Amino acid sequence: MSSTPRPAELPPEKSAHRSVSLTRDALGHYTVTNARGGTMTLGDDADFTPVELLLAGIAGCSAIDVDYFTSRRAEPLEFVADVEAEKIADEQGNRLTDLVLTFRVAFPEGEGGDAARAVLPDIVKRSHDRLCTVSRTIEVGTPVTAVVESAPTGPDSIA
């Protein structure tokens, strides 16, 4: 059980702890593991960088919202979500500005496709304004607390 406080505005069934663990594989190369056992690598070669993962999180989070709502009406012929941003360094430090999420979605002709096209703008807006946890966290902002835990040292400390 986590001691992390839950946001007051969420009922307990809507508040859930999320976590990943990053392990260093080599200088500039890391493996991230989620609680379900999924893994991915990140680093400075062909792997995703942390900034690219943030952008992928924005695209993925909103795309899931949009896909679930529109695919109930028609299976898309094309479904692409692109995210772009400018990385800057200023008096506030390194950060991204001017984030833009663009959806390119095509549906078949016919009643289902027409229905999906009709709800698409509203679903994109709802995802942006309320549903996508990733982009909402960025837009609303939340503190990030960095903690250093003591790690065992010496040759006998590694199992």
Each model region followed by its residue ranges:
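Extended beta-strand/beta-hairpin segments
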Residues: 1-56, 64-159
